[in-house]
Amino acid sequence: MNVAFHTLTALAIGQTAACRIDVADRRGRRVAIAILVFLLGVMSHGVLDGLPHEYPFKWLGDTVSTTSLVVIWMAIVQPRHRVLLLIAIAGAVVPDVIDHVPRDLNRHLGTHLPELTKLFPWHHPGGSGSLSGTVAPDARIASIANHIIVVTFCTVMLWLSRRALRLRPATGG
């Protein structure tokens, strides 16, 4: 899936976990939660890439939407939670960094980085749900449905964990 969807999922993971951390928590507990958040980010990448999907955003749209999500969320989340959200994002994008960045840099910038065998199973043809070329109508519908499910799930998780945000509810009167 586009990086924007991996990032949205990571924000939902990180913000939900942020609600489970208290300032008074032991350092060991905070570190354990951070490690878990990173691993959940990596695992979410596998789940999303395993779903049948097309890429609704080209590279520029993906870059702009991903950057916007991160900038906006860093502005509205409580400052003490920012690192946890960045850890979740790192976990969610590290599979692409490891498996795709050397190839992409070689292709687009003419570098000569070694291109190793893909580490993550969901980046192999048999493990990826990536749809390319001529896509059957049923597969396109499945892709759209999967994107809607991901966005809906993340939106609900972000709403339920909104106490991690700096936003204050309006007071009546």
What residue spans do the PLM features occupy?
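N-terminal membrane-targeting hydrophobic helices
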Residues: 1-173
